[in-house]
């Protein structure tokens, strides 16, 4: 986390310098690649560190005797504490192998089932889940899932998961990066579904839902690359962006800047 904080401090300093340049008569209107890269690294680091921290926390709970008991009443106090400690107001759940699950939001057994979630077979095969996008069955919020299996005697007996609100993650990034008005961040999964965005109304949309159809192929090409640059027009305004892929989440992170 120290590295991320350092990057944010550097980003703030560089962004302040960029703003000062913008007021000078000889200022350029193009994105500074160096400045944008620092901000991109800070943005990606903030999100990855937050989600990996959640994963670390639920793994610690998953190895407890309470979690291994597959008993909600025994496990509930630990999950309640975890839910209250999370900065992004998340729903913590405790799932059984048949997909039924308990939630801290519901304060017990829910009427929903997780077995139809695309990540659930992976979870039941003993693998962690990090970065899957869902509309939470517990809350209805646009969320990212972080989950881990609970193993006992070599078998998966339960799973602990957290559905984090993407709106609050975006606000968390906004608060900690303090970008200028003409610069913004966004990320998307492999299907070009927007996961976080400075403009919260654009989350859980595809680029073609925001602009014209020409954005589809442009972003599809970008999502095949590990990193790169992308220039496009949105609502008549020219946008320059740089991006890079997160191996941890299988998301692409973008920093974009609108030309004057």
Predicted regions and their residues:
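Solvent-exposed, extracytoplasmic
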Residues: 31, 35, 72-86, 159, ...
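Extracellular/periplasmic ligand-sensing ectodomains of membrane signal-transduction proteins
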Residues: 69-141, 193-212
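Membrane-interface helix-start motif
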Residues: 25-27, 171-175, 259-260
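Extracellular/periplasmic juxtamembrane segments that couple receptor/chemosensory ectodomains to their
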Residues: 24, 210-260
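Juxtamembrane extracytoplasmic/periplasmic/luminal helical "stalk" adjacent to the first N-terminal
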Residues: 17-71, 84-88, 129, 142-143
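Bacterial N-terminal signal peptides
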Residues: 2-13
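Extracytoplasmic/periplasmic ligand-binding sensor regions of membrane-associated signaling proteins
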Residues: 101-176, 223-238
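Short N-terminal helix-loop-first-beta-strand/juxtamembrane motif that initiates sensory/input modules
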Residues: 49-59, 81-101, 128, 175-195, ...
């Amino acid at each position: 986390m120290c590295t991320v904080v350092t990057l944010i401090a550097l980003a703030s300093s560089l962004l302040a310098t960029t703003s000062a340049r913008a007021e000078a008569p000889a200022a350029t209107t193009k994105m500074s690649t160096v400045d944008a890269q620092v901000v991109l690294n800070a943005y990606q680091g903030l999100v990855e560190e937050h989600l990996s921290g959640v994963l670390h926390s639920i793994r610690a709970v998953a190895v407890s005797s309470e979690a291994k008991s597959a008993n909600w009443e025994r496990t509930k106090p630990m999950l309640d504490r975890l839910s209250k400690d999370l900065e992004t107001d998340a729903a913590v759940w405790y799932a059984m192998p048949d997909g039924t699950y308990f939630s801290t939001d519901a304060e017990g057994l829910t009427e929903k089932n997780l077995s139809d979630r695309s990540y659930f077979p992976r979870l039941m095969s003993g693998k962690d889940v990090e970065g899957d996008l869902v509309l939470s069955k517990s809350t209805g919020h646009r969320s990212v899932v972080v989950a881990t299996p609970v193993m006992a005697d070599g078998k998966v007996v339960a799973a602990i998961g957290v559905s984090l609100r993407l709106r609050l993650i975006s606000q968390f990034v906004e608060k900690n990066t303090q970008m200028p008005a003409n610069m913004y961040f966004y990320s998307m999964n492999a299907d070009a579904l927007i996961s976080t965005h400075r403009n919260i109304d654009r989350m859980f949309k595809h680029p073609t839902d925001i602009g014209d159809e020409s954005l589809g192929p442009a972003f599809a090409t970008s999502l095949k690359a590990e990193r790169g640059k992308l220039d496009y027009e949105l609502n008549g305004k020219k946008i320059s962006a740089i991006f890079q892929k997160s191996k941890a989440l299988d998301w692409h992170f973008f920093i974009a800047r609108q030309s004057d």
